């Protein structure tokens, strides 16, 4: 047993080259153009740079957003106990919950991540269970006491130093095990902060110093990010954190004052001091239009990142740069477990990458070591595969190939410093921009022959700030064709990735716009053909046979059908006809067919036949246009060759592809619905359906995955097995999901369940392979609840409180304004509620007037003040009464529930009640006194 005692990062200059950009100078032919400005039309003119925004990233934030990829490593007792949160270890010894009997393999994990393009590794040195994966002198709840002979944090640090991998430290503030957590007296009973015997804030700070001040930890002693997870289990709120003290300690050892550091250590979960923010979910995805700015209030130590389930969207006009960080998992859980060790598919990881990095955020992917201290080979291989797909996708920038011309609608001062060619020079510090007074500009990339691509990358010069609030990407199939919109939206930021079905074009145009007074600036632009693994997947579930409508071997047409292409269609292909009796046939092998196409306000009906037998009339009319959707689904068919025939009846019919179940009658399983709603402390019953055949037995698991809902909101270990026996087409699953009671004010949260681990291998998991579950917050803060609190708070009276009124009044005024603002966001409403509730709790009830807290006479015209009698500075009982003493009494009829009872004047003396007061002005004051008397006179 050890005796308890109480008592960095590398600064990098701006302009780091993007990880996977092509190396070497751009090979761009800057030929003459009919319109626009090319490099050849620019010269050195000494034009000043445009002004930077007030809010820009510091060097560490800039590097992180350019690095793009970081990894998380969750490892600890939970790894050995098949759980996510160590809430129930109780008094078990460290050796009972942590059983690593061989050396931790840090080298393989770090090397694999580095080779796959990851630039940072964040380590859970201490999770919520309080167990430390290093031998800490401040606790005996660590690896040393568990019998592990090494120092896992030091071993990972050594590997990161070898491979030059940035490091982040995860040190959970919430500590379930530590005795000093919360407020307890000498006997261990709950008490007030003032009477707390042990100080958890000191304990946590000591551990920060122990790690951050020791050169054996970190990448050569440096940490670039400290993660203070905001998770707090229900009932764990009786501990206020001394964040300011902790922040000072972090920067003392790892901040910009340390030699070699150009910026402070980044902080996650640090309230107003946050420099890396949670994206709002644990799915690893960001909002489509994400801003890298939040609004912080240092006086109140609050942050508002425009949170609206399941995203923190940021603000265009935020006052602080906060890197949007998307934390997600390569498996279903954060910690490894025998039932949650299957890695996500490359398609799932691709979606995560494009929806995080491609939405102006960083991707933080958790890679969990197993109970042998190594990373499973399938997980390592998936990391390698992911890294290879990133490299393969972005290796060749078609906008840099020989024979390319890049034109700009405007170039700032026609200066070579801001020429269009800067966007393909692989240098983040250079950029293209426009003259002052312009708030929109475009770049047009032209090729001498058509190029096939499916990814367009746009990077804003964020060293000057994030300002672009509109973008559009267009293409021309040929020089004389019309412009077709590939994608449009709002934000660009560090990177905007537009991924579509493959298209061929001779020109691509990128148009960006900003607010008044600001010019657009782009540092890099790329046009790419995605690797096979990173291609935009069609709507077909994995395992189905798919046929595009341009496959003229399987699809046959008569009369007038009109082929067209576009990124909005499955595989970029569509064929339509509005000619009555126009016919198509599709021949396929399988047991069920889905015809995919377009629904539109201008589309109509068609008759469908299977094997020359009429099946039904389909109606493809819809109020809004959708592409890539199911327009026909057959019944289950006998395994074999079949022919589908479609005959146009009225208006237009658009067809894109056919999907077929063709696995010998084993079939496809899926959840009945794609969305469910649950209450807290609830269980969910779902139906799993089987189509396309019922031959043999199919088993699968229903696996829960965190989203904006985290482990305290639902049972992460609940993963029931689904079994559909031979001939069975439907099964009901009880307890498919189980929610918990979370007494924290969280708002509605969401997680998902998905069908995984199917058996046999040729079984198909269908369109509804996963479902989103919304948990309704029993304690949710909404506008009505805020309004109720405002009304209740408005009834409080200033004269009843000696401290905290000014803060309370300010919070009340702000809450009232927010409640009346119809455009107030969910986050703004929540913050206003919490601020008012906290200010209300902080009010100190007045006991009496004193020399330092005097009653103030109202001297301004039209004002008044109430003096409660029971707030007497002194009460002198001079009459010697035994029954009717002059003292404070309590009755319901009295204002504030109290009054001065029995003031008497007798031969022996006169009772006196005195008040400390202050009269700022000399004059006559009018007093109305309320009293009662026991004397009839």
Residue ranges and their predicted role:
Residues 19-35:
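Sec-dependent signal peptide cleavage junction
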Residues 36-427, 431-437, 444, 457-459, ...:
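Mature catalytic domains of secreted/periplasmic carbohydrate-active enzymes
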Residues 665-781:
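Short boundary segments that mark the start of a structured unit
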Residues 517-530, 651-661, 698-700, 749-751:
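Edge beta-strands of jelly-roll/beta-sandwich modules across compartments, strongly enriched
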Residues 393, 425-536, 583-587, 596, ...:
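Aromatic, loop-rich ligand-recognition surfaces of beta-strand-rich domains
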Residues 779-858:
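Beta-rich interaction/scaffold domains
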Residues 532-665, 858-914, 920, 933:
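Glycan-recognition surfaces in beta-rich domains, encompassing non-catalytic CBMs
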Residues 466-478, 601-614, 937:
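Short, surface-exposed beta-strand/strand-loop-strand elements in extracellular ectodomains
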């Amino acid at each position: 047993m050890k005796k308890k005692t109480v008592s960095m990062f590398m600064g990098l200059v701006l302009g780091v080259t993007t990880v996977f950009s092509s190396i070497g100078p751009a090979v761009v032919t800057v030929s003459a153009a009919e319109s626009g400005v090319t490099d050849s039309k620019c010269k050195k003119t000494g034009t000043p740079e445009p002004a930077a925004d007030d809010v820009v990233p510091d060097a560490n934030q800039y590097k992180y957003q350019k690095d793009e990829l970081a990894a998380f490593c969750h490892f600890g007792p939970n790894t050995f106990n098949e759980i996510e949160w160590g809430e129930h270890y109780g008094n078990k010894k460290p050796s009972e919950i942590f059983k690593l009997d061989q050396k931790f393999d840090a080298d393989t994990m770090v090397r694999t991540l580095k080779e796959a393009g990851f630039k940072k590794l964040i380590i859970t040195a201490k999770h919520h269970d309080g167990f430390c994966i290093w031998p800490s002198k401040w606790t005996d709840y660590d690896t040393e006491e568990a019998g592990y002979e090494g120092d896992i944090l030091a071993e990972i640090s050594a590997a990161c130093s070898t491979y030059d991998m940035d490091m982040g430290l995860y040190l959970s503030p919430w500590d379930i095990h530590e005795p000093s957590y919360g407020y307890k007296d000498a006997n261990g009973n709950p008490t007030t902060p003032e009477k707390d015997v042990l100080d958890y804030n000191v304990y946590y700070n000591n551990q920060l110093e122990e790690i951050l001040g020791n050169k054996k930890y970190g990448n050569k002693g440096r940490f670039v990010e400290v993660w203070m997870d905001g998770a707090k289990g229900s009932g764990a709120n009786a501990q206020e954190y001394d964040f300011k003290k902790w922040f000072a300690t972090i920067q003392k050892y790892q901040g910009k004052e340390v030699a070699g550091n150009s910026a402070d250590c980044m902080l996650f979960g640090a309230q107003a001091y946050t420099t890396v923010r949670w994206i709002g979910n644990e799915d690893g995805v960001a909002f489509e239009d994400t801003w890298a700015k939040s609004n912080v209030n240092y006086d109140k130590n609050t942050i508002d990142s425009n949170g609206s389930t399941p995203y923190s969207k940021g603000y265009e006009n935020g006052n602080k740069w906060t890197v949007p960080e998307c934390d997600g998992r390569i498996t279903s859980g954060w910690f490894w477990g025998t039932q949650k060790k299957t890695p996500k598919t490359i398609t799932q990881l691709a979606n995560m990458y494009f929806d995080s990095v491609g939405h102006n955020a960083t991707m933080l992917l958790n890679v969990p070591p197993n109970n042998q201290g190594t990373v499973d080979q399938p997980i390592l291989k998936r990391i390698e595969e992911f890294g290879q797909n990133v490299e393969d996708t972005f290796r060749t920038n078609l906008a840099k190939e020989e024979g390319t011309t890049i034109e700009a609608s405007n170039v700032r001062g026609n200066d070579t410093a801001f020429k269009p060619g800067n966007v393909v020079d692989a240098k983040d510090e250079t950029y293209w921009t426009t003259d002052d007074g312009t708030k929109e500009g475009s770049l047009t990339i032209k090729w001498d022959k058509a190029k096939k691509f499916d990814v367009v990358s746009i990077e804003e010069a964020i060293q000057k700030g994030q300002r672009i609030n509109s973008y559009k990407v267009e293409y021309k199939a040929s020089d004389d064709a019309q412009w077709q919109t590939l994608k449009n939206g709002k934000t660009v930021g560090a990177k905007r990735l537009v991924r579509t079905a493959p298209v061929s074009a001779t020109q691509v145009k990128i148009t960006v716009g900003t607010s008044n007074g600001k010019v657009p600036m782009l540092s890099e632009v790329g046009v790419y053909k995605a690797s096979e693994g990173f291609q935009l997947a069609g709507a077909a579930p994995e395992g189905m046979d798919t046929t595009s409508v341009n496959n003229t071997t399987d699809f046959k047409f008569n009369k007038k059908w009109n082929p067209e292409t576009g990124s909005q269609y499955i595989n970029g292909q569509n064929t339509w006809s509005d000619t009555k009796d126009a016919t198509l046939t599709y021949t396929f092998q399988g047991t069920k067919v889905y015809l995919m196409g377009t629904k539109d306000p201008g589309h109509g009906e068609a008759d469908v036949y299977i094997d020359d037998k009429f099946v039904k009339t389909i109606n493809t009319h819809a109020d809004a246009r959708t592409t890539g959707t199911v327009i026909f689904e057959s019944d289950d068919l006998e395994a074999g060759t079949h022919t589908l025939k479609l005959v146009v009846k009225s208006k237009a019919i658009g067809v894109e592809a056919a999907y077929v179940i063709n696995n010998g009658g084993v079939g496809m399983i899926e959840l009945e619905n794609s969305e469910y709603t649950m209450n807290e402390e609830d269980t969910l019953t779902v139906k799993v359906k089987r189509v396309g055949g019922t031959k043999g037995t199919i088993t699968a698991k229903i696996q829960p995955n965190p989203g904006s809902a985290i482990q305290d909101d639902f049972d992460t270990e609940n993963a029931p097995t689904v079994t559909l026996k031979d001939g069975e087409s439907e099964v009901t699953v009880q307890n498919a999901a189980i929610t918990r009671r979370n007494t924290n004010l969280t708002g509605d949260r969401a997680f998902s369940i998905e069908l995984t681990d199917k058996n046999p291998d040729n079984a198909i998991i269908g369109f509804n392979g996963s479902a989103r579950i919304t948990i309704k917050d029993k304690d949710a803060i909404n506008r009505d609840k805020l309004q109720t609190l405002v009304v209740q708070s408005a009834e409080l009276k200033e004269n009843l409180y000696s401290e905290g009124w000014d803060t309370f009044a300010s919070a009340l005024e702000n809450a009232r304004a927010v409640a009346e603002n119809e455009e107030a966001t969910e986050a703004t409403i929540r913050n206003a509620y919490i601020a008012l509730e906290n200010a209300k709790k902080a009010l100190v009830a007045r006991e009496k007037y004193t020399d330092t807290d005097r009653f103030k006479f109202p001297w301004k015209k039209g004002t008044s003040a109430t003096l409660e009698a029971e707030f007497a500075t002194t009460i002198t009982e001079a009459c010697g009464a035994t029954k009717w003493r002059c003292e404070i009494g309590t009755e319901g009829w009295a204002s504030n529930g109290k009054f001065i009872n029995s003031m008497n004047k007798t031969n022996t003396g006169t009772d006196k009640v005195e008040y400390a007061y202050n009269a700022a002005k000399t004059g006559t004051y009018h007093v109305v006194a309320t009293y009662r008397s026991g004397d009839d006179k």
